[in-house]
Amino acid sequence: MERLMRLTILLFLGAVLAGCASVPSTSAPQAIGTVERPVPSNLPKPSPGMDPDVLLREFLKATADPANRHLAARQFLTESASNAWDDAGSALLIDHVVFVETRSAEKVSVTMRADILGSLSDVGVFETAEGQLPDPGPIELVKTSDGWRIDRLPNGVFLDWQQFQETYKRNTLYFADPTGKTVVPDPRYVAVSDRDQLATELVSKLLAGPRPEMARTVRNLLAPPLRLRGPVTRADGGKSGIGRGYGGARVDMEKLSTTDPHSRQLLAAQIIWTLARADIRGPYVINADGAPLEDRFAEGWTTSDVAATDPGVADGAAAGLHALVNGSLVAMDAQRVTPVPGAFGRMPEQTAAAVSRSGRQVASVVTLGRGAPDEAASLWVGDLGGEAVQSADGHSLSRPSWSLDDAVWVVVDTNVVLRAIQDPASGQPARIPVDSTAVASRFPGAINDLQLSRDGTRAAMVIGGQVILAGVEQTQAGQFALTYPRRLGFGLGSSVVSLSWRTGDDIVVTRTDAAHPVSYVNLDGVNSDAPSRGLQTPLTAIAANPSTVYVAGPQGVLMYSASVESRPGWADVPGLMVPGAAPVLPG
């Protein structure tokens, strides 16, 4: 029965994942219950005078520490209950807990009610959720010589939300994208109270591999048989102050099978960006089988040595801001607007466009008879400043999005996802369908927007006003498929109009919600609202990079930049305050 109840809860959770919850923005992650380490000092312990209700609440807080198979939480159990309790698998994060008791002198039976706010997998993957906790089954407490103890409880882990926020922190692992051009974020939550153990924990997670849904979308240069020889230390071998000051970090591994220089560079990039983003500072001494990973970096690597893979760099930054004004593509030059040379500066009726991630090409949608029964759309692709070739057509086309391999992704007639490429043999345009069966079966409806992440391994879509995220997987036959779709940002409701990736971990959306017309949502599913001062609705298109968000409103294009937060609100983009103008960035 307990196994059936756990299955029921997991099925229920699968239906409600991607809800809205507030999660720490600075954070660190660990496979639950696998690491031997000191118990955090803020965790409660049972005491003889605890009332059953208090003891249960303190038990839920103690489950926040996964170390040694939840040893801290097991102190609240009788020996028989501890032996029977299966704490493996995902934890449910719960809040607003209510206990309903049936009491006798020596025994208390309890049923638990609570709100589900999310789940935490056994590898530290957090996803938001919303809904009521199904009845997990009875909880029984008995009086012992040491006070009340839990003698029966459901299998699985129920984790107190507030204690989760205090104990777990968010960090990001990085894996290589399939092209080897950049690294891909994989956010994790870990509970590490000793800062000097964090580097070892994060590298161990890299060695264990990406979250399951990313297994076929990224490469892991730290895959087995590679393993750590021992804990990560300071660069000089010291065991304290790792990654602080000028101490750096030293990673010693063994059983390295990677030989080519580019793969070794990617391996180093995975380690360096994972540690650097966790504020574990270099230099990073990386050794394999008793020798430096690269002789030229024997004294240590820095982030500059792997800058080409920097996950925070804006794609095609040199290309700058472009826009569609009166149906043609223009470029911004020192706050002056000039039509781009070539086809894209001449063609009328352009309704959506994107510059390639290299900044050298353009994909643009031309729509004739917009809104009419005979509306027709066509996709044109070519060099920025050059001529264009028609690459796809249909009754309607979504805003195009570029992948790292210079393919253009577009949705034809709201439900057919295509990759438009230049055929290597003939040089002619080729249209290759993308398998979107998994998306259509779980989230049926029109795909109104589709944008690829900067690393090309994820696709964010707007379906029915909701943000849907899917993995981009290349099959053995060389085809592409959208896999593992899930909803992000339940708190956004069904108000989303368009979206853009701000970073590899952060999406910004426009909404029909007049009070919150622009919002953010991250890969965990956590959403938050952007400032709305200075915005007029409705907003249509949106384009973003790590530093700036641009939106198309009734009066033209406006911008919000993190660098000018001392002056909150949105600012006009000079030259683009034209009704119908839409921002265009690489991506």
Swiss-Prot record:
Signal peptide range in chain numbering: 1-19
Keyword Membrane included in the entry's annotation: yes
Keywords tagged on the record: Cell membrane, Cell wall, Lipoprotein, Membrane, Palmitate, Secreted, Signal
Subcellular location: Cell membrane; Secreted, Cell wall
Membrane topology per record: Lipid-anchor
Source taxon at top rank: Bacteria
Pfam families: Germane (PF10646), Gmad1 (PF10647)
Assembly and binders: Interacts with MtrB, probably extracytoplasmically.
Job of this protein: May modulate activity of the MtrAB system in controlling homeostasis of the cell wall and cell division. Partially restores antibiotic resistance to M.smegmatis in which this gene has been disrupted.
Family per similarity comment: Belongs to the LpqB lipoprotein family.
Listed name of the protein: Lipoprotein LpqB
Species this protein is from: Mycobacterium tuberculosis (strain ATCC 25618 / H37Rv)
This protein's encoding gene: lpqB
